[in-house]
Amino acid sequence: MGLPWYRVHTVVLNDPGRLLSVHIMHTALVAGWAGSMALYELAVFDPSDPVLDPMWRQGMFVIPFMTRLGITNSWGGWNITGGTITNPGLWSYEGVAAAHIVFSGLCFLAAIWHWVYWDLEIFCDERTGKPSLDLPKIFGIHLFLSGVACFGFGAFHVTGLYGPGIWVSDPYGLTGKVQPVNPAWGVEGFDPFVPGGIASHHIAAGTLGILAGLFHLSVRPPQRLYKGLRMGNIETVLSSSIAAVFFAAFVVAGTMWYGSATTPIELFGPTRYQWDQGYFQQEIYRRVSAGLAENQSLSEAWAKIPEKLAFYDYIGNNPAKGGLFRAGSMDNGDGIAVGWLGHPVFRNKEGRELFVRRMPTFFETFPVVLVDGDGIVRADVPFRRAESKYSVEQVGVTVEFYGGELNGVSYSDPATVKKYARRAQLGEIFELDRATLKSDGVFRSSPRGWFTFGHASFALLFFFGHIWHGSRTLFRDVFAGIDPDLDAQVEFGAFQKLGDPTTKRQAV
């Protein structure tokens, strides 16, 4: 036929059998990728330290999605929370991967069958004997079936009525586990961080989809609307389908980047806004203050801070710190976290406590500045010693650690104090192993960043695809170059060939 690469899809334009075939093949490719990617990730994933080396630090992409839907066990005998198990059951990580690969193979065979046996009786219009599809009816069927699936997911899987529930955690990502969720039917259901909204919204949306599907199955569109929206043209279906996909992609890019109950930080890592707002730092200080109020010593109060909470309060876990084109996991950047050194408290020779000003998200370098409780600069690491007034040496800054591996250790040597002041710019201080993976010390983004970038980019691309194909189907007569003053009107939705003498003509 000699079609250019950007026109090859015209071969399925008037061929419902092969149109179905290529869509089944697409499903085979998607499911096959998902299953294969899951097996690859399971081959390289290290489940031994869920606190300091969780899935998102290791760059896992599909494991978090399986986990949030209730999969926590592996046939390898480990659990995602760090425990060991003896009976993982069929629906383990490997079981889900295998199911996707088997499904992919079946779809592959079905696609071949439908490509070979394309001229089926079901696709023929008995009035004309030509291939045709009742698109409004097909729309109703798909809407009804997707409504059933949506309702079933919300009413059974999420609620635990028939299924495991979903991943639910506290606001600071410390106690996450898979559990059933009750639907939230009040105003709280509209809070994106309330898991109950996931159940109630799926039940409500599924019910609406079922009713809308039944409506479109039982009510035919008016003729003027049918013609006005080109409902007989398959490119109309393509355009509106692309619209649904790009809208969904924009929505999930937002819920991933800004955070929600559907994107727990234990599975995808913290958001950049939690660093920007000092979210974890405030909670840590609140817990320490509560400990001091109970007559604990500073050392005891800091020792009770969970290592997991301290690790979230580290800039290396901020997804906005990794460049878009820095390939690899977070562990390939700053290294594998081994342990929390503790919280450094800086003091000048007068005994005044000083706080290191933290590095903002979009800075690669930042001056080391130490301020007191009132925000007044008391010490720094100067760029030019000759003009220095507040250098660590001049002010006599010391550092003492509370909690962590260096609990109770203090340093007064200026070089050591400056080293820890620089590291305190990046949040809580951790020992990082860069040797194992030959990590280069340059921050990487988390799967939260990759997912957002990918979905926002494709959503924009698909938005233009929607405009393109929508314009083609709505203004097809204009693009085909038909004289607007033509006395007879060609019905393009039903007849493809221009200039065909057998094409029916209808007076305007």
Swiss-Prot record:
What the record notes about the co-factor is: Binds multiple chlorophylls. PSII binds additional chlorophylls, carotenoids and specific lipids.
Mind telling me which Pfam families this protein's record contains? PSII
Keywords (alphabetical) are: Chlorophyll, Chloroplast, Chromophore, Membrane, Photosynthesis, Photosystem II, Plastid, Thylakoid, Transmembrane, Transmembrane helix
The protein's matches in InterPro entries, at most eight in alphabetical order, are given as: PS_antenna-like, PS_II_antenna-like_sf, PSII_PsbB
Annotated GO MF terms: chlorophyll binding; electron transporter, transferring electrons within the cyclic electron transport pathway of photosynthesis activity
* Summary of the function given for this chain in its UniProt record: One of the components of the core complex of photosystem II (PSII). It binds chlorophyll and helps catalyze the primary light-induced photochemical processes of PSII. PSII is a light-driven water:plastoquinone oxidoreductase, using light energy to abstract electrons from H(2)O, generating O(2) and a proton gradient subsequently used for ATP formation.
What is this protein called in UniProt? Photosystem II CP47 reaction center protein
Please name the source species.
Capsella bursa-pastoris (Shepherd's purse)
State the gene name recorded for this protein.
psbB
